[in-house]
Design a protein with these regions (language model features):
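Long amphipathic N-terminal alpha/beta scaffold segment
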Residues: 1-5
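Internal, hydrophobic beta-strand segments that form the core of beta-sheet-rich folds
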Residues: 28-39, 76-108
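Short acidic alpha-helical/loop segments enriched in Asp/Glu that coordinate divalent cations
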Residues: 22-29, 44-48
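Short amphipathic, basic-aromatic surface patches that mediate peripheral association
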Residues: 13-24
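Intrinsically disordered, low-complexity Ser/Thr/Gly-rich stretches
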Residues: 36-54
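A beta-strand/beta-hairpin structural motif
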Residues: 48-75
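Structural beta-strand segments of beta-rich domains
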Residues: 6-10
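Eukaryotic short linear interaction motifs
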Residues: 18-20, 40-43, 94-95
Length: 113
């Protein structure tokens, strides 16, 4: 994905849910994009989150943009750490079941800005 240097929005030109390796029994996943902003002077973090996205393994490829709530702006002296979280689940009608199998939950640090 590409991260915008000004507003930290995350964009996939072609986001394909079917390309993910779904654990046994999983039918859907939830994707969380967040930005950790670290201030070394005060040794504090502020966290910004985009709305959680849910996709099915049956969904098709799409252009996907995630924007952060609260509108962080880049400031000198702060460190910006974009992070993706992923959680697989099984959805049967109205019922949802968390998947606790191997590789059912993941987190990825996308670097430092």
């Amino acid at each position: 994905p590409r991260i915008d240097a000004l507003d930290f929005s995350l964009e996939w030109a072609r986001f394909n849910p079917a390309a993910a390796k779904f654990p046994k029994g999983a039918t859907h996943f939830e994707l969380l994009y967040c930005l950790l902003v670290y201030d070394a002077a005060t040794n504090t973090f502020v966290t910004y989150e985009a709305p959680i996205l849910r996709r099915s393994k049956e969904d098709r490829s799409e252009r996907l943009v995630q924007t952060l709530e609260g509108g962080p702006t880049k400031e000198e002296g702060l460190q910006y750490i974009p992070v993706l979280g992923l959680r697989f689940m099984e959805v049967l009608g109205e019922e949802e079941y968390a998947n606790f199998g191997k590789d059912a939950v993941g987190i990825e640090v996308l670097g430092m800005l």
